[in-house]
């Protein structure tokens, strides 16, 4: 679904403090990371590369993986403008079947990317691949939307977003029993001739409990270190709006 909303993606998430988030990532590495320098970092579901670029500015060699060609095109252009292209490798791959050239010391996945993996089987495929490419005791850091986000913010709400040359209508439908929220997206994109073309897309997210995520991590060779509700390492509950997961790769 992110192919059609790529032009609006950064506006949707414009208020996010990527610097503070990167500080939180680095503090996790200081507290829990492997007994070796963290130099190679994997950003899974990197989107337009905002976090990938933030970490590259801090000296890390980054690999960004995403399933949307349009999002990666924006990421490449931003890296070029920032003069960081030499520190980047961009891969157009599915998160449940990606392949890397070697191991990394740290893997991150930001902005509820993992919620888009909607079956337990695919979640374990994803986690097993990350485990395969992490060094022993390497960290996996990701966030998931919690119960409050699904029930009170997503719910059955509708949103309208507008950017120069683009207009988007976003409708949600959340099923508490299946814990699946479906997104119905309609985008009107302005062409060079001034006419608008309509695009329709369907996406979904699944709400995971901390307990179910801990089990999936354990089944795939990870130790859950913590689940936090903010960047101050406050313990999260399933009712938290966003849950930040820190897990260690055991080999």
Kindly give the residue locations of the regions a language model identified.
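SAM-dependent methyltransferase
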Residues: 121, 141-214
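Class I SAM-dependent methyltransferase SAM/SAH-binding core
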Residues: 40-42, 49-97
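C-terminal lobe and adjacent flexible extensions of AdoMet/dcAdoMet transferase-like proteins
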Residues: 204-251
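Residues lining the SAM
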Residues: 110-112
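A short His-aromatic
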Residues: 115-117
């Amino acid at each position: 679904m992110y192919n059609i909303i790529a032009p609006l993606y950064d506006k949707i998430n414009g208020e996010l403090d990527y610097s503070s988030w990167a500080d939180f990532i680095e503090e996790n590495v200081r507290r829990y990371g492997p007994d070796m320098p963290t130099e190679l970092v994997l950003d899974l579901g990197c989107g337009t590369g905002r976090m990938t670029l933030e970490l590259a500015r801090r000296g890390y060699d980054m690999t960004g993986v995403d399933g949307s060609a349009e999002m990666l095109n924006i990421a490449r252009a931003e890296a070029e403008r920032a003069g960081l292209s030499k520190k980047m490798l961009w891969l157009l791959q599915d998160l449940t079947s990606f392949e890397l050239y070697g191991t990394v010391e740290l893997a991150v996945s930001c902005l509820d990317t993992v919620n888009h993996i909607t079956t337990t089987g695919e979640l374990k495929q994803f986690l097993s691949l990350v485990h395969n490419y992490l060094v022993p005791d390497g960290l996996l850091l990701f966030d998931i939307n919690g119960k409050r986000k699904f029930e009170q913010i997503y719910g059955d709400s509708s949103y309208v977003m507008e950017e120069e040359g683009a207009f988007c209508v976003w409708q949600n439908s959340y099923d508490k029993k299946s814990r699946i929220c479906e997104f119905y997206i309609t985008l009107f994109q302005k062409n060079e001739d001034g006419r608008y073309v309509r695009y329709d897309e369907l996406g979904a997210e699944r709400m995971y409990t901390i307990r179910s995520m801990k089990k999936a991590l354990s089944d795939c060779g990870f130790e859950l270190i913590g689940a936090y509700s903010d960047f101050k390492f406050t313990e999260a509950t399933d009712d938290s709006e966003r849950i930040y997961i820190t897990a260690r790769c055991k080999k």
